């Protein structure tokens, strides 16, 4: 392909928020204009270089690698330079120079290289002195021609004939101002000129959208006066346009072609590159065989002891295990993967040695006996029937991939160890790129174009949300009618707004969608290289870390030859670690290494569906499945973990029925019974598919893995080929063709969603471990769970409810008991706290003298003490500060004592308000409302007190002689106010739920609580009436339209319901505020997937009660109390209430000490919320 011009100044969206072009688009544009080559020259980085090279080569376009860098020529003298790789040496130097801009210590000035860096790494590079942004252009703009010539000579001296002057014509004044002088200097110094054009968007019509992109970059609106702009000419000009533009400088056009001919390197894939594990003259093959055999012997000694295996059987097992070990080792060594296994084994052994909990396995790697022997996994693959070929297939060579779960809190320690062992320059994290996806791009563009927030928010809500497959804006406009109308300029149905502006927002968003917006770091991926990373890939450093980060995404890092290791932080392992620590403090040691999975208490708990906090078994549907399954072995837990997914879930009833002998298993063929017996005839695992192919059709396990993959992908051609092989092999095994075809079809159906048994088994073990801890040590386990969820108040509520269900006492937040984190106190633990109110009601002056401290002993029960760090606005560090002060100087005696003893900087109004609302000072002062209203004065007192202490002016004066801190006068808050104080400060109701008072009434009105909902209601579709306090409201969109989810609570639990009907939303909008008390009539669907509630109508609590006739049985203790009841009821018959309202009272006992008042209220009788609080004191 011949061309008369090559673009050298093309930027992609890897120049974040500067270019509106993707890699694919720039290549397509070059091909469209019949260019044989294209230079990608992003600003400051080579993040897209390998992606660009591979895509360009695929499309038969020559890729040229360039980068625009800032270079420091002198103190405070910075300018841009475009560097282009001529050959492989040049590309490697380009990697080093671009990486230096991120890794230099003086990045605070700007991302740049020094002139000395260019001298050091100039080999193989072509340099273009950027036009107005380059050093020569900047000097000319400053009217310093002598300086311009000086810097040009310096660059020419270093680069020789590899140094060019760039010239641009975007019709900008600054370009025209320097052009003549610029060309003159080039001529005098014999420096060739190349014509370039900034390529930031595809065509001139995209200038508007690109301008919006620049505004997004700067965080300003389009009306902002002093913002960055670029010429409308920064588009992908054709060769003809460029020739015409530079018709007076034909050599500048020709030089782009000449320069292209000097470049002959393209970034390419590399084979995997690992560091040498051993620094001595010992082969990795020798080491892995040695360590694996030693490790297997140690594993078997533990196994034989734990399982009490006879000596005779031990020898037989040794032969079986070592045969499998040697088979795996031969494959691993032949594939040259010994080093990989040794590296993984080394950092896992280090972790375990240093007390860092590592998961038993994850993914197919748990199927390897070598991995088990090297302590990479803790799962016996032969015992659990796991296959090595599922992990490493000798018939399909690919890199092994161990994903390792670590205790989340100590994962960084393992990474630091790897860095120290292999070198900081050879270990790195992996970059990820955030893109402008549909919802985000609408928000960005709407902000720039000043679309009202309400309209912008509504627009984004119209885009359906999918975490797995994000919906594009184009797709959303096709599928959501209201969006489609808005895109046509018809505005929004439910909102007033400028229809044309809304259309412009959508049009612009469609253009910018998919562009890179920013970079971040992969959550788990770590690469370890055999050489410095910068020799292979671009690297950079995040501002928050000193660790190198590979500048290619995960996909392109692996293509470049880097080996990825996933260091995953699993929160459950942190729960286990912290629970074991709590137990160790009590002298209880837990060792899971030789666990036999036969604890009856554990299975009894699971059979009751008590899955809260148990790994994998926390969902409502899972808990229901546990109750029906009644698991009694680890194999049941593994199977349920694999089955509980869309697709396989439909086989749960079959598995349960066969387990409980209510149905006969179908093994498909007698030869398959040994394979399917464990799962009652249900094909659950991918390994079962492999074994079926091996036993029935003569496949090798490697070939069977290829069959499994084909079945999973459902590619028709592959399936037809595999079916032919399967049937042919089965016929050779004396199975009829029709039966073979039938079995193939059945297995293929299961294989489509079959689960990796190695992964299921490893995670089943973690499930068992958490269940064991919960069943045997519930308080310690739940405290460990709580302390990882300090900011998740829904989870805290869930765990505390579970604690109550287990008979564990909960101590509300208390400034003299609580710590930064949740804590557990066992029986006979002494808890010291104040018991006497320190301040009389409505007293305006704090009295710190009248204090009584008492010790409480909680016998024969565990107690969980609420964490200060779980209160909103309060951190665990503040909790530690409080705890340390208590340990040093004793319990706080009053709120002034508290304020005086803590540094004033540690206490602010919001923190103090929330501590008060949460009830932390209830035992120091019995009027929470009074303290809350006095916060400003308390904060003022804190400031003045500490100022006086610092000045030492009052060092000899007693505190009581200072000006008194005045509390405002206040009555006591009612129970509901206090309950909502707690909700506002902790996100939950801890001492009293607003609906507690109504439970007796609700039971008479057939209003269910959530305990009944989950435990008594049969499966199927029903209608129920529930009552709850709205705790959270969230509006969402689906393809069918808007819907709202509500999170509510009652005294028993938290539940979620959905409102799909716009009519329901409209009719009851006045009742749907957070903190509203409502009764809801809803449809309920209860099945294996859990419980789904759909709201049909709402009532306020008052209306719900007063619209029904019901009966109350009250127990006044005397005539005075009876008179109070009658007075209350009489008061509700007047004042606008219906005159025919009736309340009938029956005295069932004449004994004055044992009144029983039976009250029947008519449908028209009206009671208020506060009435039930009064009446409830007489309900037994």
Swiss-Prot record:
Question: InterPro entries recorded for this chain?
Answer: DNA_pol3_alpha_NTPase_dom, DNA_pol3_alpha_thumb_dom, DNA_pol3_finger, DnaE2/DnaE/PolC, DNAPol_HHH, NA-bd_OB_tRNA, PHP_dom, Pol/His_phosphatase_N
Q: Which UniProt keywords apply?
A: Cytoplasm, DNA replication, DNA-directed DNA polymerase, Nucleotidyltransferase, Transferase
User: Catalysed reaction(s)?
Assistant: DNA(n) + a 2'-deoxyribonucleoside 5'-triphosphate = DNA(n+1) + diphosphate
Compartment annotation: Cytoplasm
Family annotation (SMART domains): POLIIIAc
Q: What is its EC number?
A: 2.7.7.7
Show the GO cellular component annotation of the record: cytoplasm
User: Into which family does the record put it?
Assistant: Belongs to the DNA polymerase type-C family. DnaE subfamily.
The function of this protein is: DNA polymerase III is a complex, multichain enzyme responsible for most of the replicative synthesis in bacteria. This DNA polymerase also exhibits 3' to 5' exonuclease activity. The alpha chain is the DNA polymerase.
- Which NCBIfam families does the record associate with it? polc, PRK05673.1
The name this protein carries in UniProt is DNA polymerase III subunit alpha
Q: Which organism is it from?
A: Rickettsia typhi (strain ATCC VR-144 / Wilmington)
Q: What is the lineage of its organism?
A: Bacteria, Pseudomonadati, Pseudomonadota, Alphaproteobacteria, Rickettsiales
């Amino acid at each position: 392909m011949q061309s008369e011009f090559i673009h050298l100044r093309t930027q992609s969206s890897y120049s974040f928020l500067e270019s509106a072009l993707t890699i694919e688009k720039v290549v397509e544009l070059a091909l469209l204009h019949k260019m044989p080559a294209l230079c990608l020259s992003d600003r400051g980085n080579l993040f897209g270089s390998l992606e660009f090279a591979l895509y360009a080569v695929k499309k038969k376009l020559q890729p040229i690698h360039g980068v625009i860098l800032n270079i420091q020529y002198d103190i405070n003298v910075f300018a841009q330079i475009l560097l282009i790789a001529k050959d492989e040496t040049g590309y490697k130097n380009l990697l080093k120079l671009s990486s230096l801009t991120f890794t230099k210590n003086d990045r605070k000035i700007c991302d740049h290289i020094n002139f000395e860096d260019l001298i050091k790494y100039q080999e193989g590079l072509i340099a273009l002195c950027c036009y107005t942004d380059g050093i020569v252009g900047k000097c000319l703009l400053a009217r310093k021609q002598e300086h311009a010539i000086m810097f040009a000579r310096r660059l020419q001296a270093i680069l020789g004939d590899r140094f060019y002057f760039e010239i641009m014509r975007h019709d900008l004044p600054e370009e025209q101002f320097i052009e003549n002088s610029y060309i003159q200097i080039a001529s005098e110094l014999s420096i060739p000129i190349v014509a370039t054009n900034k390529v930031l968007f595809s065509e001139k019509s995209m200038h508007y959208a690109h301008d919006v992109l620049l505004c997004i970059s700067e965080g300003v609106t389009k009306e902002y006066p002093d913002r960055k702009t670029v010429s409308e000419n920064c588009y992908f000009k054709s060769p003809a346009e460029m020739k015409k533009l530079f018709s007076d400088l034909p050599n500048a056009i020709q030089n782009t072609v000449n320069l292209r001919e000097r470049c002959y390197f393209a970034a390419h894939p590399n084979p995997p590159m690992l560091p040498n594990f051993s620094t001595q003259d010992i082969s990795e093959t020798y080491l892995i065989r040695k360590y694996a055999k030693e490790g297997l012997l140690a594993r078997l000694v533990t196994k034989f002891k734990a399982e009490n295996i006879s000596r005779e059987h031990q020898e037989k097992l040794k032969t079986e295990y070592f045969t499998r070990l040697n088979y795996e080792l031969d494959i691993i060594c032949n594939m040259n993967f010994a080093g990989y296994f040794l590296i993984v084994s080394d950092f896992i052994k280090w972790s375990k040695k240093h007390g860092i909990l590592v998961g038993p396995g994850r993914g197919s790697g748990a199927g390897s006996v070598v991995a088990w022997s090297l302590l990479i996994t803790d799962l016996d693959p032969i015992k659990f029937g796991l296959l090595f070929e599922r992990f490493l297939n000798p018939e399909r060579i690919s890199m092994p991939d161990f994903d390792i779960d670590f205790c989340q809190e100590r994962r960084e320690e393992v990474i630091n160890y790897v860095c120290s062992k292999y070198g900081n320059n050879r270990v790195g994290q992996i970059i990820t790129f955030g893109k402008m996806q549909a919802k985000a791009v609408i928000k960005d563009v709407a902000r720039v174009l000043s679309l009202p927030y309400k309209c912008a928010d509504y627009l984004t809500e119209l885009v359906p949300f999918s975490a797995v497959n994000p919906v594009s804006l184009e797709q959303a406009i096709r599928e959501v009618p209201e969006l489609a109308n808005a895109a046509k300029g018809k505005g929004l149905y439910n909102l007033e707004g400028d229809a044309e502006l809304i259309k412009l927002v959508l049009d612009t968003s469609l253009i910018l969608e998919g562009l890179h917006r920013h970079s971040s770091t992969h959550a788990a991926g770590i690469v370890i290289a055999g050489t410095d990373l910068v020799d292979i890939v671009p690297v950079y450093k995040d501002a928050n870390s000193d660790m190198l980060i590979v500048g290619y995404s995960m996909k392109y890092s692996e293509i470049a030859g880097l080996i990825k290791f996933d260091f995953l932080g699993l929160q459950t392992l942190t729960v286990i670690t912290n629970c074991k620590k709590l137990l160790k403090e009590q002298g209880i040691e837990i060792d899971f290494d030789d666990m036999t999975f036969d604890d009856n208490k554990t299975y009894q708990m699971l059979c009751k569906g008590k899955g809260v906090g148990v790994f994998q078994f926390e969902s409502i549907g899972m808990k229901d499945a546990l109750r029906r399954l009644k698991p009694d072995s680890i194999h049941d837990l593994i199977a349920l973990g694999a089955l509980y997914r869309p697709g396989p879930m439909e086989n749960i009833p079959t598995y349960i029925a066969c387990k409980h002998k209510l149905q006969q298993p179908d093994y498909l063929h007698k030869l398959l019974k040994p394979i399917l017996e464990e799962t009652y005839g249900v094909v659950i695992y991918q390994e079962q598919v492999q074994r079926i192919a091996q036993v029935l059709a003569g496949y090798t396990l490697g070939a069977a893995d290829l069959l499994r993959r084909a079945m999973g992908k459902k590619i028709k051609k592959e399936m037809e080929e595999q079916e032919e092989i399967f049937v042919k092999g089965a016929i050779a095994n004396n199975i009829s063709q029709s039966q073979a075809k039938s079995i193939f079809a059945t297995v293929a159906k299961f294989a489509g969603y079959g689960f990796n048994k190695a992964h299921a088994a490893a995670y089943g073990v973690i499930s068992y471990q958490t269940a064991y801890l919960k069943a045997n040590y519930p308080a310690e386990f739940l405290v460990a769970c709580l302390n990882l969820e300090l900011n998740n108040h829904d989870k805290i509520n869930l765990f505390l409810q579970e604690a109550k269900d287990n008979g564990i006492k909960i101590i509300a937040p208390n400034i003299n008991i609580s710590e930064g984190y949740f804590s557990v106190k066992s029986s006979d633990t002494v808890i010291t706290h104040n018991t006497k109110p320190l301040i009389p009601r409505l007293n305006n002056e704090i009295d710190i003298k009248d204090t009584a401290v008492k010790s409480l002993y909680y016998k024969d029960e565990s107690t969980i003490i609420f964490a200060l760090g779980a209160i909103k606005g309060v951190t665990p560090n503040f909790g530690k500060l409080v705890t340390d002060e208590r340990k040093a100087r004793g319990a706080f005696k009053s709120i002034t004592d508290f304020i005086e003893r803590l540094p004033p900087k540690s206490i602010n109004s919001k923190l103090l308000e929330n501590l008060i609302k949460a009830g932390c000072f209830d035992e120091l002062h019995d009027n929470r409302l009074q303290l809350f209203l006095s916060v400003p004065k308390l904060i003022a007192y804190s400031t003045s007190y500490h100022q006086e202490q610092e000045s030492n002016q009052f060092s000899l004066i007693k505190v009581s002689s200072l000006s008194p801190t005045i509390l405002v006068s206040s009555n006591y808050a009612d129970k509901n106010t206090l309950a909502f104080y707690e909700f506002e400060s902790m996100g939950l109701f801890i001492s009293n739920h607003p609906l507690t008072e109504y439970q007796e009434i609700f039971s008479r009105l057939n209003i269910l609580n959530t305990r009944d909902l989950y435990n008594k209601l049969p499966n199927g579709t029903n209608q129920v009436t529930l009552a709850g306090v709205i705790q959270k409201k969230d509006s969402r969109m689906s393809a069918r339209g808007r819907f709202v989810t509500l999170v509510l609570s009652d005294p028993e639990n938290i539940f979620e319901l959905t409102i799909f009907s716009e009519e329901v939303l409209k009719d009851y909008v006045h009742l749907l505020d957070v903190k509203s008390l409502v009764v809801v009539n809803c449809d309920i669907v209860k099945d294996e997937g859990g419980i789904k509630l759909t709201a049909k109508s709402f009532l306020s609590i008052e209306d719900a009660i007063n619209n029904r006739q019901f009966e109350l049985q009250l127990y006044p203790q005397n005539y005075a109390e009876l008179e109070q009841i009658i007075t209350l009821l009489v008061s509700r018959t007047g004042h606008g209430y219906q005159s025919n309202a009736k309340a009938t009272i029956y005295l069932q006992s004449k004994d004055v000490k044992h009144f029983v008042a039976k009250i029947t209220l008519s449908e028209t009788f009206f009671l208020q919320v506060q009435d039930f609080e009064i009446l409830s004191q007489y309900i037994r």
